């Protein structure tokens, strides 16, 4: 298999994407347009579809230290949903997370829940997906290491064929402005 050379660009991107999920969610192009409308500085890296951190590790990214891993979890009563966003090289122990943050027992949310709440498929989970959470059910638990200099984070634009690099503070502001809660958490 040939090596894929992703490229990075500033601002908008002229590609079409197909939204295979809910019709009311922001697709990749709409995310780019939304970020431009908010006058945010961002950078885009296009790459083949990736469904795991192992697959993403095979892609040459401009800021691999800022790439995010996202875990969409729920409590045992399916009342509370959390998006745990950590640096890509970290592991999250859900039992330790639950104990430290006082949640009920946590497990991974189903693909159906992911689609119903954030309009995403497995492999495309991203903090930008909470912009599709009309009921503001998802609380984002963001690894505080993303706040350290240079304060950059790489997340999917609701599609696993690209990574958007933006300031962590801008991402927090977007999510908060939408009405979802953002927690800064320490993940060892």
Q: What would you call each of these model-derived segments?
A:
Residues 2-4, 9-188:
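Extended, low-hydrophobicity, polar/charged segments
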